Amino acid sequence: MNSLIIAEIPSGIWNFPPYFGLPVDRSGLTVADYLKQRNIIWKFGDDPTADVRVYKEENIRNGLISFRRLKNEYQKRIEKKPYINLNGEAQENSRIAYFLADPERTLSVAPGNRYKRLFFPREWSDPGIETWNQRMDRICWIGRPLPERIRLAKNIAAMGIDIDIYSKEPWPLKNWMGYATDEADVSQKYKYRVVFENSLKNLYHSEKLFNSIRTGCVTFYISDPNLELPNLKGAYLSMNHDNILKREELSQEILKNIGKFMLSGDWEIYSFKSFFDRIIDSFR
């Protein structure tokens, strides 16, 4: 098979060269070596020798109307070079990008019923289930203080449940702990964690749930109610009053399913191998 030259068009918020030294899966093979195995020549920046291009969309705060966007849209529409579009933003934060996007050439974390699913890639880690009982019997929450999140945190605290909150921006609650400099290290100290997605629409699904599960937290997840994650079935809890109150009773089954998920091939939907395969296979 001939080499495929891919030009990754730089973005102001998301670029892939930092991934190349990371393990592509549990094998220890790096992303760079895996791309070589697949006969891929990856170029960062536009390149006249490239066979195809990869674009990454940016949100409303990052130059919707910019020279870079105009150039990218010109290339997509006028030039004949194949491309794929990656959108890591909620649809409500990237309206123009979604309006302009070709559904056949777009992978998205908020695909709705129009686009193809994109999973953010992350490294595998041991969830440490065997030492779970040694963790703090408290709930951890890492996220920005948005109004609906503050209301939920107050409701949890009003139930007499211990919850610690981490973020750069202060929360108007006494249990705000400051910034979590290492998300994984903080999470591994807690038995439970709340994950509240940035959007509850269009089947939005980020890396947040996997980040929690791979650290062995029993996770209460708030997302689009229509979102289905069959690979993760039984490995997390929906956020509701009953699940919070029964968390100790439910935790052993959740932990068992986390172990199955992380030690089987199911977790690989979040692997760098799967991420780059989806891009490459779009062109082959």
What are these regions (language model features)?
Residues N2-Q91, R95-E169, L173-R284:
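Pol beta-like nucleotidyltransferase catalytic core
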